[in-house]
Amino acid sequence: MIEIEALTKRYGSITVVDRVSISIATGSITVIVGTSGSGKSTLLRMINRLVEPTSGRVVIDGSDTTSEPAHLLRRRIGYAIQGHGLFPHRSVAENIATVPRLLGWDAARIRARIDDLLKIFQLDPGEFSAKFPHQLSGGQQQRVGVARALAAEPTVLLMDEPFGALDPIIRAKAQDDLRDIQRRFGTTIVLVTHDIDEAFRLGDRVAVMSNGQVLQYDRPAELLTHPADPFISRLTGTGDRAMKLLSLTTAGDAAEQGPAAGPAVAASATLREVLSDLVWSGAPEATVLNADGTERGRLTLDRVLARGRPD
């Protein structure tokens, strides 16, 4: 659990973050979203004390972050930034090994961790360990950057616009990979972005910031259906609210029991994708299949459309 309590940062007479208080559940992904200058990156950096707060405090698992030296705190909190931030003169393996070496891990443990992480990120250790950052694609660089942030097995991972420099296809894959890895390790992730679609795609909860304040901290569906401020309505958009809402639910979660004669859709597909399939095929319902090919249930067009409306 991360408790952010009345956290404030001022530079002279300018207040960048203004008495922010939020609680972040262990093992969840929280996304902080806002426009440029809203204070979101400053808030993130106060969690690991890259920026020292003017007032307020951060408590991680019951311990105030000021109770230990800042450099020791940062060694147990993963940190990934836009553009990967890899050391250009170090190999992939050396980059990933950075924090474990600072923590005094033995060579065998470090080597095993490097190999495990590269395999998890679908990078062959034999092929990629000795490569340097300039020899990697943008997507590969970003994966190595996240692998480095996870190398010392942190319970908390901070990410500042980690996918902002990637093209849309690679970015979507990187987002899916992050979700899969978070489920695997149970890491508590706090991620900053200016992209509301990315926030909804990744976040269990989303904090919307403007002028240094958190206007609303809630589940994505609540931000769409019950925005607490006109700024949130503008940020989330009104023209495609139904599509965004459908993107938040999977076919497996919405399926009902009963046979269906329509096109097959994966249980992991979003209702937005199911709607597209039904409109394209002209079918009134779809058959929902589990990953192993067994039938999960069915989804009618009416049931899908109902999920695109507020309660």
Feature names for model-found ranges:
Residues Y217-D218, H226, R298:
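ABC ATPase "signature
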Residues N48:
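Helix-to-loop junction immediately C-terminal to a conserved catalytic motif
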Residues D64-G78, L102, A108, H226-P227:
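ABC ATPase NBD coupling module
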Residues E153:
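Conserved catalytic motifs of ABC-family nucleotide-binding domains
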Residues A108-E127, D180:
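Conserved ABC ATPase "signature" region
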